[in-house]
Swiss-Prot record:
SUPFAM superfamilies in alphabetical order: FAD-binding/transporter-associated domain-like, FAD-linked oxidases, C-terminal domain
Function (record text): Involved in D-lactate, but not L-lactate catabolic process.
Superkingdom assignment: Eukaryota
Residues modified to N6-succinyllysine: 335
GO molecular function, one term: D-lactate dehydrogenase activity
Protein name (database record): Probable D-lactate dehydrogenase, mitochondrial
Positions carrying N6-acetyllysine: 36, 292, 335, 422, 449
Transit peptide start and end: 1-52
Lineage: Eukaryota, Metazoa, Chordata, Craniata, Vertebrata
Subunit structure and binding partners: Interacts with CSRP3.
Family: Belongs to the FAD-binding oxidoreductase/transferase type 4 family.
Length: 484
């Protein structure tokens, strides 16, 4: 063990061909003891149940557990664990809250899962500069609770109460993206432990400026890297003023086409909508049952507006007129916080509502994003393909920026149905690419969309990504098997 600890302090050492792995494929006892010496015995586990828990996310991808799970308490421990793994050729899998849906935490080659949830401090708040620095265990809800009396908030809202550093790692988005942008637009700086244990501050240590023309955009490189380039141990985020007033609304439509046409026209009219979400008839039926709503079972838009009382009245008037021109009905306002929260809770619980439609089934979720002008076309075609494939599925999405999700229900014991679901997801990704879009707007590539990534960015794009990966992670130890 002493030798392993000495090696962990070195920056470069000969490739050891997984010499720390025992003869049965797990980690050697000496290596496990070395991990305990870094983070403490209570913060290392090789128990089967713990490893299984950390070997999967919310996806249906066939996943493998790591060989060990560690809970570092600070960035120095993360650096030392990474260095130890790097020098011993052991794969590293960062873990936040495990709410991803593309198999991003699956340990395809075993290795060490670094659970970052014990690092849960908000280390700096700069209200005058509209920025905050958080550790990887801080979730979106925890941050906004902390900000409640500051007049500021962090709006990126993927639904699940994900960790903010995990959201940065996956390039997450959410219901507010149409107004406030995605994680790519709201991350100012990152602290990253590189695979060999070195510490990188992507915009410079302690910097939280709004813009810079200094060199390459290293922050942008790591946002959306899905744990394949390094371990994000801190993120500096852009905050926004909390809105003076908020109003939500719902409106039902006679068809998918009418609902999406309204979306496009609302955006073209420059209505500064904060959220505009589409739910198809299947999803509305599920939400009515699961969340005790009383909405028409029809294609529906959920909307939210932020601003002053005066501007909100104007926004609602213009939006209602547009929806009526497209056959919209049952236009309902929700001004009280309790009613708004009920509405958005139903939207965020769409995954569980869909699952309740078919007890015993598993849910498979996939997402794409297309230019707004092609959104009506792809949504109508996707709805038709779900029916043609004889699958049970719902469509829900952040249509204000062209992004939507399909939640498909699958019998886990029906191999043929699983094959049809996989074929549907691949067809949807290729349909989005054919329309000038992307195979994923916010879920990421993970395990399931690596082939589609190659089709999206082309051979030169993939090779450039591979060269970047090889430069930062020459031993291929950071979350192997993902993205590339």
């Amino acid at each position: 063990m002493a030798m392993l600890l000495r090696v962990a302090t070195q920056r470069l050492s000969p490739w050891r061909s997984f010499c720390s792995r025992g003869s049965q494929g797990g980690l050697s006892q000496d290596f496990v003891e070395a991990l305990k010496a870094v983070v403490g015995s209570p913060h290392v586990s090789t128990a089967s149940a713990v490893r299984e828990q950390h070997g999967h996310d919310e996806s249906m991808h066939r996943c493998q557990p790591p060989d060990a799970v560690v809970w570092p308490q600070n960035v120095d421990q993360v650096s030392r664990v990474a260095s130890l793994c790097y020098n011993q050729g052991v794969p590293i899998i960062p873990f936040g809250t495990g709410t991803g849906v593309e198999g991003g935490v699956c340990a395809v080659q075993g290795g060490v899962c670094i659970n970052l949830t014990h690092m849960d401090q908000i280390t700096e708040l700069n209200t005058e500069d509209f920025s905050v620095v958080v550790e990887p265990g801080v979730t979106r809800k925890a941050l906004n609770t902390h900000l409640r009396d500051s007049g500021l908030w962090f709006p990126v809202d993927p639904g699940a109460d994900a960790s903010l550093c995990g959201m940065a790692a996956t390039g997450a988005s959410g219901t507010n993206a149409v107004r406030y942008g995605t994680m790519r637009d709201n991350v100012i700086n990152l602290e990253v432990v590189l695979p060999d244990g070195r510490l990188l501050h992507t915009a410079g240590r302690g910097r939280h400026y709004r813009k810079s023309a200094a060199g390459y955009n290293l922050t942008g490189l790591f946002v959306g890297s899905e744990g394949t380039l390094g371990i994000i141990t801190s993120t500096t985020l852009r905050l926004h003023p909390a809105p003076e007033a908020t109003v939500a609304a719902t409106c039902a439509f006679p068809s998918v086409q009418a609902a999406v046409d309204s979306t496009v026209q609302i955006l073209q009219a420059a209505v500064p909508v904060a959220r505009i979400e589409f739910l198809d008839d299947v999803m509305m039926d599920a939400c009515n049952r699961h969340s005790k709503l009383n909405c028409p079972v029809a294609p529906t838009l959920f909307l939210e507006f932020h601003g002053s009382q005066q501007t909100l009245a104007e926004q609602l008037q213009r939006t209602e007129a547009i929806t009526q021109d497209n056959g919209g009905s049952h236009f309902s306002w929700a001004k009280e916080a309790e009613k708004r929260n009920e509405l958005w809770a139903a939207r965020h619980n769409a995954w569980y509502a869909a699952l309740a439609l078919s007890p015993g089934s598993k849910a498979y979720s996939t997402d794409v994003c297309v230019p707004i002008s092609r959104l009506p076309e792809i949504l109508v075609e996707t709805k038709e393909e779900i029916k043609a494939s004889k699958l049970t599925g719902a469509i829900v999405g952040h249509v204000g920026d062209g992004n939507f999700h399909c939640i498909l229900l699958v019998d886990p014991d029906d191999a043929e149905e699983q094959r049809r679901v996989k074929a549907f997801a691949e067809n949807l990704g290729r349909r989005a690419l054919a329309l000038g879009g992307t195979c994923t707007g916010e879920h990421g590539i993970g395990l399931g969309k690596r082939q589609l990534l190659q089709e999206e960015v082309g051979p030169v794009g993939v090779e450039t990504m591979r060269q970047l990966k090889n430069t930062l992670d020459p031993r291929g130890l950071m979350n192997p098997g993902k993205v590339l």
